[in-house]
Amino acid sequence: MIDRLDRRRRGLPRVLPALFVLLLVVLVGGCKGLVEDVGGGGGRAPADLETSAAERAAWPDPPKDAVSAKVQRVSDGDTFVATVGGRRERIRVIGVDTPESVDPNQPDEPYGQEASDFAKHYLNGETVRLAGDAEPRDRYGRMLAYVWLRDGTFWNALLAAEGYAQQLTIPPNVTYAPLFRRLVAQARRNHRGLWAEENKHQASS
């Protein structure tokens, strides 16, 4: 009996390292999964989006001359302040238009606050990539840009596809106009975002 206990005790040092390694693998794997769930695009898990990962992967990648920018503050769904090349710039995304939510003298437009919250969730404090079109700035002096999130998602397209924006085509800045037109039409057809609100208003009238 004593002999058997001694043998078991002598076997413990061999078993403990193996158990420790197994526990470490489980913990690291769990942490990796958590990071992947909240990575890219400001922390929102892809499961919260209406569009699939495959759909988003098919959208254009940032061009080689895209520049890096650090988002400082989101004004509303389609406008934010960022540091670009050491300068503070107001950025207006090209090709889409979200409902207004920043004028203190006017009531928010339907779905304006939701669009603003969506942008804050994805952009605040994030590093993004910017690319321009034919005109570098609008009449208000804002930098016009196509925007890509740090995971490569085309932000302008995401706003359109998720139902947070309508198309706004202002020539000559029309590089991705056909894409935005298609995505807005799909969002409207699928009653996403502001288009669901539109259906509610139509049903109640």
Which residues are covered by each model-predicted region?
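Small beta-barrel nucleic-acid-binding modules, primarily SNase/OB-fold domains
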Residues: I2-S205
